[in-house]
Amino acid sequence: MHYVGIDLAWGQRARTGVALLDASGRLVSSSSVRTDDEIVEFLGDDARGPGLIVAIDAPLIVPNEAGQRPCEREVNAHFHRFHAGAYPSNRGMAAFNPQPRGARLALRFGWDMDPRTPPAEDTSVAIEVYPHPAMVTLFDLPRVLKYKRGRGRTVESRRNELLHAMNGMDDA
């Protein structure tokens, strides 16, 4: 098995982070790209074929016309108090109609998006992930780390939050 992580922007203007990891979880390569074609070019043949788990930080399956998906409601019920909730996604939003960007990539690469399909050596699966709730849980945090750009956040404060997260990885 090997792994791909995609911090997928909902549109093709903002940057998307892409990382490829080997079977032991070591980083092989990473990049920041914008378009689906750039993602395909970066990943190339490493993201095709069996034995691959692709973790995508973006909605993959969006059947609802309005409001939130049940998974978003569930995440928000448990993680809102940690400032680690999920944004709502629905087909009324242009980014998800007719199809979410993550689903388009999964189809392009042949990744199975069915959440009932277990990862295996003879298949490649794409799973939707929620990094902020994962960080809160894995590192036993009182709130999500504020390492992204935002109102009132300085470069120094964001750097400190990111270093805190990275230091926590040694303990996880």
Where are these regions (language model features)?
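RNase H-like (RuvC/DEDD) metal-dependent nuclease/polynucleotide-processing core
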Residues: M1-V4, L8-A172
